[in-house]
């Protein structure tokens, strides 16, 4: 049996005892795998109304190798509740299917204002549609080979962030 711990290791194990309520195993070999990115990639997103899109996104960020996923309750959010239990199962399934030894940390939904007030080190990006605020090309900014910082990417709801939310994010 092959086991993953979600923190960079695959473990080869042998089943030693099976009962009606549990299965005992003995780890025979462990192999650690380094992350493909030296720092953390954190996606904070306002969930869409259609939960299938959120489930698909959760699967893909696991396969790609993101480190953290947060859900934001924004002014124009159409979905105010996300069930993390289901998304945790999707993360585990996607990690197994894509043979990833690292799984992203899934955070509880939080208000945009509370999220922005939390400390975040490294590079920060916000996707928005407003012309009055400066814009950075994300691909160009992240395409540098010498990036040695954590990266936080904010993505708003289907109606975009409010002007106040973008302003608050850029000030913090």
Regions from the PLM with identified roles:
Residues 109-149, 153-154:
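A mid-sequence, solvent-exposed acidic-amphipathic segment
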Residues 30-126:
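RNA substrate-binding interface of SAM-dependent RNA methyltransferases
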Residues 48, 159-160:
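Short, surface-exposed acidic/glycine-rich loop or hinge patches that mediate macromolecular interfaces
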Residues 1-32:
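N-terminal positively charged helical leader segments and presequences
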Residues 5, 73, 128-131, 157:
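Short secondary-structure boundary segments
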Residues 154-157, 172:
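Thr-Gly-centered strand-to-loop micro-motif
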Residues 162-172:
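Structured adenosyl-cofactor binding patch, chiefly the S-adenosyl-L-methionine
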Residues 10, 20-22, 36-41, 148-150:
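Short connector loops at helix/strand junctions that flank enzyme active sites
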